């Protein structure tokens, strides 16, 4: 007992003796190394943990739970399966517990508990490469979109398809801050956005943005997003979620300019304005932004990689300029970084010598810092010296460049002096006051990182191999070091995302042989104690010019920060530093312009000033309205005692945005010192273009250039004194044009005539009638110049030169050429550098002309044809006319789709032209070439046949015979713009009498199914004066009584077409009603509103016309006849009003408007008669915009609205509205609507369900010709096409279809119905077994085919037996007749046996067709099998229709292309 007490007392005494500290201070950090055979590819920490994930370049996937000391392979917790190789790992950005690992084999992993467990899931499609493979929901971390190369899907626990054929999908809530202050949780929680192909065109300029609130379940197409003024926009490239914003980038065809649309709720979108700057594709970078503004850097100098930094207002609509000449690299990376955790501090690098850089000198980069959110910038200072630091474009680590969550600690590699030097010559600099002052830290470049909220700073030399780690415990004032075991080339240094840990990870490469090493470096033992309250300071994050704490967003910001000299660690892992906010009184900096600011920045311009109820009677009257200022959302300033800029102010009525319009048409007349114009072109803004100009460039007969930006109201002479010979508009960029002179000098504009820059060509323009300039479709600065060489000697010839910088430099491409063209096309594989040239053999003009091509600027080339006459490019086809080797006086046509393989065209036998002298390529926008083959080229008797190709342009069928052409080879054929498949042509009705000298008699015909069937035009019943025509018919026209129109061959300007792509369904023409087309003096003017079904007489006599405002406005004026009056219609030609545009009579030769026909202004070209200006060219600008004051309201999601209705094109031979196998719907303004369309890009509203196949979806096959009843019959004496050719051409084909006489129209999407091209299939030779497998009936199928009819027969017989009551036709009410045992009772053998036999026999007879059908379907694989490989497939959905490759646009803008011997004649006036 005593011993126990003594033991207890001894223990107590020992306990009272002072003990040595358990946490003994160490001089060195703890270092642990892990060797790897392969390089780490991706590495990250889970937030608030020591767990690290790492993937290696060979696909290995590892994890560590102790900050990198020990590593293990990641495996599924379900089956222990290791997912390798892993191609992508990603931490969920909004859920710190989740991460995803995507495997290359479709097997993937997800963790929801920071890698403690992993769950596998399978998606077979490969992860996307061009888009982020995983897209995360900002509110609900269980929702993820998986984007693959094939499609896009979303998954949580299960995986299901989201949207096929999407160019990219995202959640509407792409960030936790999105719509966080709005009551939109239910509306947005499941909303997804997808960029999808256009309904008719799969190329980028037609892409649409759609959304769905149920993962596209109820509507596979989704609902189109109204991006611009409540209407959808085409050309959507991508979307991006940036804090509380979503940004959509849009680019229209024909311009490089982008439009950015911004929303904060996905419902209301606005176009962002950039203070006069234009944004181009791949020329802007979305930077790290705040919760209250977007920051964007816009490329201004592509060749020298410089930009301008912009910051938006709080709704992202108006951007103000922050700083010019920001430094960028080729990938669009910008030297820009916000200091982490501190509001308003931004570091950027700019170019000091921008002018010298543009002339080819090296950049001199300097560093700048802003402490007021980019309003002003100042240099970085080390004492009195300027400091320049390497930034994002030369960053050599991961994570942020300069800062971390450690408050106020900033580091960088650079130098003092005039400008930034090479990275290898830089030193390490540090600041502990958020960049206000800097000091030198270590010599040489280093990789660096912050830990323990800045209490530890670690660095390692980045100049060669090193084994020395430097560290500082006092904000970089003094440095210690520790050596590691191996010398390494460091590749990355990192730590926990919040920089609160004392443990760092260092990855380095030892040498080529020994692989990589991962070091875990733990500084926990370097201080003995944890910091106490006295070791902290209240540190102000921003200081003003007086050194006092500064206000931003209505408050001052402070941090509780460890003092630099405190000998302790904060040691609060995973506890982020929290800012302390103190409010300030409101100042002007707390307000922003609601719309945009004035030029001086001192006031705001409101988006719209509402006029008070009493209205504005006089422009100088005043009223009280909003100032245009507003408090920045999120600003916390105190209004009491501060500034208040958002109160109402006084405005004058003339400043109001909705003052009633004048109700009048305005006119401006201008005169020119020339008798006439030589040429004019519109440089039209596209939908994504900024500005509101309507630009025209015009060349007079005196070779003077004039430019107007207001549709001819005023004109300027920007190149006065320069003799311009020709205007060449850029065919792929409507902002650009080139102006050529007689010499080697020229000018160009790429900003719609705002400026013109000179360029020097390598030679004067070619003296032959050849294209001098040709352009690349995608790279719009790539040019080919064809110039005249050695013309002073006897060997004048043309050479081709190429420039890739808009004429700054030229290189010789080919010598002795006729023409050279880029043949790059969307959908044509590997064609970026593809060029075709017509070149004389052996560079001798006396030799044959060859067609050659090259993909490497003719370092080597391919000869396709050795005796070519000409070639033409139309849509996806290259068509070549070459001499027939067997008939030198005849031609052979060949075509290619890929630009590599050419196939000779197979002409139909009913086009019998023994000597083929000329072809005219008419049009090929519907996956088929329309080719006019000249049959007769006798003067005054020219005509030919229009033949139409299959989808690869090789096999032709007759579409229409005896089609009129003129001596120059142009053809009376025109496609209707805006609606596919409608075309008008003039045929010669008296072909047999032309040889007798009788003049041609023309009739006009129309097709509604792309040339498959043609009819005469239906004549109107009465003329414009209400009088009857000499004949009358109901429905389509008949010989002797139909409408005939003067066509393409009689036009002064090929741009004066019947129709417009924006005026859907409308056509105007000049002609007459009768047996054939009469003279122009007999012609009247006619209009159709239903795409040519019915016509109405508009005016007696010949008029010229233009459409405006997408068809809601039509203007006509007498052609070449003294007049001072024009006529206009606001209801699609139903009624007409007159307007006197001149006080003296004029002769009007032309009327013009923008090519899209969407303007409300028109320009009349002519001369005054009997005036002092009668010898001068005059233009009259007529502006109708004052007639109406409002825009029409369109609801895309509603079939009908107050201002619009849905219109469907029809086919004359069908009762439904199916055209090419589907129903199209277009929005058209109601003629009675008193508003303007104001829509620059009308488009298909929808493509309805695919229709069953009918005769209209097919045309006659090769060697077949149409009969009088519309059927197709084999031409007498000819054999059907070789159906087995598909078996020889395609080694994978196992079947072929016997010729039926029909082939499907390439653009038809019909399904089922009368599939007239596929009736009987047969196996390919040696593929019978596979054919049987696909078509043969299985044992189970045979069993059911036999048993089911017998069972049905038995059931029917039994039914007849059990229901027989001996009283046919009786209605039994309550009788108990079942007990009757008479001869006619149902139990009688006289009844039971015959009834059973008869009923069974009837059932079997009725079942036999079902059995036959069942057997046939079984033999056909039940579901109809696919067609021959390479054939156009039908479509199961509108989604699949939208995915179809090809171009379904309207008529090609280019004039007809001529291919023929006649091109060689000296009198040929046109050359293509």
From Swiss-Prot:
Matches recorded under Gene3D superfamilies: 2.10.70.80, 3.30.60.270, YVTN repeat-like/Quinoprotein amine dehydrogenase
Show the stretches that span the lipid bilayer: 1336-1356, 1389-1409
Q: Name one GO biological process term.
A: protein targeting to vacuole
Coarsely, its chief localization is Golgi
Where are glycans found on this sequence?
291, 315, 952
Here the disulfide bonds are: none
Cite the Pfam families for this sequence: Sortilin-Vps10, Sortilin_C
InterPro entries the UniProt entry points to? Sortilin_C, Sortilin_N, VPS10, VPS10-sortilin, WD40/YVTN_repeat-like_dom_sf
In the bilayer, the protein is annotated as: Multi-pass membrane protein
Signal peptide limits: 1-23
Q: PANTHER family given for it?
A: SORTILIN RELATED, SORTILIN-RELATED RECEPTOR
Per its database record, what is this protein's job? Answer: Functions as a sorting receptor in the Golgi compartment required for the intracellular sorting and delivery of soluble vacuolar proteins, like carboxypeptidase Y (CPY) and proteinase A. Executes multiple rounds of sorting by cycling between the late Golgi and a prevacuolar endosome-like compartment.
Q: Which family does it belong to?
A: Belongs to the VPS10-related sortilin family.
Question: What's the name of the protein?
Answer: Vacuolar protein sorting/targeting protein 10
């Amino acid at each position: 007992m005593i011993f126990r007490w003594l033991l207890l007392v001894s223990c107590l005494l020992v306990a009272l003796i002072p003990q040595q500290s358990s946490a003994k201070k160490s001089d060195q950090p703890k270092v642990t190394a892990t060797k790897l055979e392969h390089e780490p590819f991706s590495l990250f920490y889970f937030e608030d943990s020591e767990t690290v994930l790492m993937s290696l370049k060979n696909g290995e996937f590892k994890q560590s739970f102790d900050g990198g000391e020990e590593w293990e392979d990641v495996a599924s917790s379900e089956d222990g399966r290791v997912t390798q190789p892993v191609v992508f790992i990603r931490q969920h950005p909004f859920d710190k517990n989740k991460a995803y690992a995507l495997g290359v084999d479709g097997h993937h992993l997800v963790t929801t508990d920071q890698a403690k467990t992993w769950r596998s899931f399978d998606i077979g499609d490969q992860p996307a490469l061009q888009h982020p493979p995983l897209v995360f929901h900002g509110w609900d971390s269980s929702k993820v979109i998986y984007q693959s190369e094939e499609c896009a899907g979303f998954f949580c626990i299960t995986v299901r398809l989201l949207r096929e054929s999407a160019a990219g999908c995202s959640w509407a809530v792409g960030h936790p801050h999105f719509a966080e202050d709005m009551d939109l949780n239910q509306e947005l929680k499941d909303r997804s956005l997808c960029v999808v192909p256009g309904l008719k065109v799969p190329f980028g300029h037609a892409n649409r943005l759609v959304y769905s609130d149920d993962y596209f379940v109820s509507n596979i197409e989704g609902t189109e997003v109204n991006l611009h003024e409540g209407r959808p926009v085409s050309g959507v490239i991508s979307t991006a979620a940036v804090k509380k914003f979503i940004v959509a980038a849009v680019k229209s065809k024909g311009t490089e300019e982008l439009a950015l649309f911004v929303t904060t709720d996905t419902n209301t979108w606005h176009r962002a304005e950039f203070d006069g700057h234009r944004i181009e594709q791949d020329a802007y970078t979305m930077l790290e932004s705040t919760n209250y503004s977007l920051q964007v850097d816009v490329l201004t100098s592509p060749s020298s990689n410089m930009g301008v930094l912009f910051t938006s207002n709080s709704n992202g609509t108006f951007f103000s300029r922050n700083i010019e000449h920001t430094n960028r690299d080729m990938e669009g990376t910008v030297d820009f970084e916000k200091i982490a955790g501190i509001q308003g501090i931004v570091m950027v690098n700019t170019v000091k010598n921008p002018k010298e850089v543009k002339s080819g000198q090296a950049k001199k980069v300097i560093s700048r810092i802003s402490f007021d959110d980019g309003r002003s910038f100042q240099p970085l200072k080390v004492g009195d010296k300027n400091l320049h630091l390497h930034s994002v474009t030369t960053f050599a680590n991961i994570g942020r460049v300069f800062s971390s969550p450690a408050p106020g600690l900033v580091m960088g590699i650079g130098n003092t002096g005039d400008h930034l030097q090479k990275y290898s010559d830089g030193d390490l600099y540090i600041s502990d006051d958020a960049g206000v002052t800097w000091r030198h830290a270590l010599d040489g470049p280093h990789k660096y990182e912050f830990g323990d909220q800045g209490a530890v700073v670690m660095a390692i030399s980045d100049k060669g191999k090193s084994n020395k780690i430097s560290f500082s415990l006092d904000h970089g004032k003094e440095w210690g070091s520790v050596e590691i075991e191996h010398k390494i080339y460091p590749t990355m240094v990192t730590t926990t995302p919040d920089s609160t840990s004392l443990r760092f990870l260092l990855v380095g490469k030892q040498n080529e042989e020994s692989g990589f090493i991962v070091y875990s470096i733990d500084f926990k033992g370097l201080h003995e104690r944890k910091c106490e309250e006295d070791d902290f300071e209240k540190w102000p994050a921003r200081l003003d010019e007086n050194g006092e704490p500064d206000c931003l967003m209505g408050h001052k910001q402070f941090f509780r920060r460890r003092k630099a000299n405190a000998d302790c660690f904060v040691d609060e892992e995973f506890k982020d530093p929290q800012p302390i906010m103190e409010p300030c009184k409101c100042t002007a900096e707390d307000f922003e312009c609601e719309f945009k600011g004035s030029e001086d920045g001192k006031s705001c311009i409101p988006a719209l000033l509402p006029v008070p109820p009493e209205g504005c009677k006089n422009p100088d009257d005043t009223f009280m309205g909003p100032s245009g200022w507003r408090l920045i959302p999120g600003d916390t300033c105190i209004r009491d005692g501060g500034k208040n800029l958002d109160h109402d102010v006084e405005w004058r009525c003339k400043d109001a945005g909705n003052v009633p319009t004048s109700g009048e048409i305005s006119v401006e007349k201008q005169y020119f010192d020339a008798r006439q114009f030589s040429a004019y072109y519109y440089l039209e803004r596209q939908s994504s273009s900024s500005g509101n100009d309507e630009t025209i460039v015009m060349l007079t007969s005196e070779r003077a250039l004039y430019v107007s930006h207001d549709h001819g109201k005023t004109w300027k002479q920007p190149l006065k004194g320069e003799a311009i010979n020709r205007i060449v508009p850029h065919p792929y960029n409507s902002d650009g044009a080139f102006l050529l002179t007689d010499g080697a000098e020229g000018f160009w504009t790429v900003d719609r005539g705002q400026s013109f820059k000179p360029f020097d060509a390598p030679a004067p323009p070619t003296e032959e009638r050849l294209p001098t300039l040709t352009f690349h479709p995608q790279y719009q600065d790539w040019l080919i110049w064809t110039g005249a060489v050695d013309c002073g000697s006897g060997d004048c010839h043309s050479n081709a030169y190429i420039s890739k910088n808009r004429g700054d430099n030229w290189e010789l491409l080919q010598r002795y050429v006729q023409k050279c063209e880029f043949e790059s096309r969307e959908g044509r594989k590997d064609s970026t550098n593809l060029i075709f040239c017509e070149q004389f053999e052996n560079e001798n003009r006396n030799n044959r002309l060859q067609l050659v091509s090259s993909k490497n600027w003719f370092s080597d080339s391919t000869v396709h044809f050795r005796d070519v006459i000409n070639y033409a490019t139309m849509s996806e086809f290259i068509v070549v006319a070459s001499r027939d080797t067997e008939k030198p006086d005849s031609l052979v046509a060949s075509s290619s789709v890929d630009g590599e393989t050419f196939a000779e065209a197979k002409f139909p036998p009913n086009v019998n032209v023994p000597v083929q002298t000329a072809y005219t390529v008419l049009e090929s926008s519907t996956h088929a070439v329309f080719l006019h083959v000249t049959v007769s080229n006798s003067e005054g008797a020219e005509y030919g046949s229009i033949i139409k190709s299959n989808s690869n342009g090789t096999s032709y069928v007759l579409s229409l015979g005896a089609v009129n052409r003129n001596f120059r080879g142009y053809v009376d054929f025109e496609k209707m713009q805006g609606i596919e498949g409608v075309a008008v042509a003039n045929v010669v009705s008296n072909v047999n009498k032309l040889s007798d000298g009788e003049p041609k008699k023309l009739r006009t015909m129309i097709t509604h199914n792309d040339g498959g069937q043609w009819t005469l035009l239906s004549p109107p019943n009465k003329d414009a004066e209400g009088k009857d025509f000499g004949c009358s018919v109901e429905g389509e026209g008949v010989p002797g009584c139909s409408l005939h129109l003067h066509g393409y061959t009689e036009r002064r300007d090929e741009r004066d077409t019947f129709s417009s792509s924006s005026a859907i369904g409308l056509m105007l023409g000049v002609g007459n009603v009768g047996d054939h087309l009469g003279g122009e003096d007999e012609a009247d003017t006619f209009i159709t509103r239903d795409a040519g079904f019915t016509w109405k007489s508009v005016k007696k006599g010949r008029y010229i016309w233009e459409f405006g405002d997408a068809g809601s406005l039509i203007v006509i004026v007498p052609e070449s006849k003294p007049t001072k009056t024009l006529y206009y219609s606001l209801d699609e030609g139903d009624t007409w009003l007159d307007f006197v545009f001149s006080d003296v009579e004029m002769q009007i030769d032309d009327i013009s408007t923008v090519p899209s026909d969407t303007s409300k202004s028109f320009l009349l070209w002519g001369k005054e008669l009997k005036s002092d200006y009668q010898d001068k060219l005059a233009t009259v600008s007529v502006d109708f915009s004052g007639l109406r004051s409002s825009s029409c309201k369109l609801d895309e999601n509603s079939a009908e609205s107050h201002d619009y209705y849905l219109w469907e094109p029809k086919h004359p031979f069908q009762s439904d509205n199916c055209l090419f196998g589907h129903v199209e719907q277009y929005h058209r303004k109601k003629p009675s609507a008193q508003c303007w369309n104001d829509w620059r890009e009308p488009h298909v509203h929808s493509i309805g369900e695919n229709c069953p196949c009918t005769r209209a979806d097919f045309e006659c096959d090769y060697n077949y010709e149409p009969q009088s009843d519309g059927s197709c019959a084999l031409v007498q004496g000819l054999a059907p096409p070789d159906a087995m050719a598909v078996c020889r051409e395609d080694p994978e084909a196992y079947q072929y279809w016997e010729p039926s006489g029909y082939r499907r129209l390439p653009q038809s999407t019909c399904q089922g119905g009368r599939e007239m091209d596929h009736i009987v299939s047969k196996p390919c030779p040696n593929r019978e077994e596979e054919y049987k497998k696909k078509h043969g009936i299985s044992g189970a199928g045979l069993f059911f085919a036999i048993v089911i009819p017998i069972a049905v027969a038995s059931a029917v017989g039994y039914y007849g037996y059990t229901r027989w009551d001996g009283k046919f036709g009786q209605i039994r009410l309550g009788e108990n007749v079942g007990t009757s045992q008479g001869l006619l009772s149902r139990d009688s053998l006289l009844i039971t046996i015959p009834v059973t036999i008869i009923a069974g026999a009837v059932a079997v007879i009725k079942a036999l067709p079902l059995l036959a059908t069942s057997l046939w379907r079984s033999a056909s694989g039940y579901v109809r099998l696919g067609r021959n490989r390479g054939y156009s497939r039908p479509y199961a959905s509108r989604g699949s229709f939208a995915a179809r490759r090809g171009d379904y646009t309207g008529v090609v803008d280019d004039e007809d292309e001529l291919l023929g011997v006649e091109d060689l004649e000296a009198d040929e006036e046109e050359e293509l």
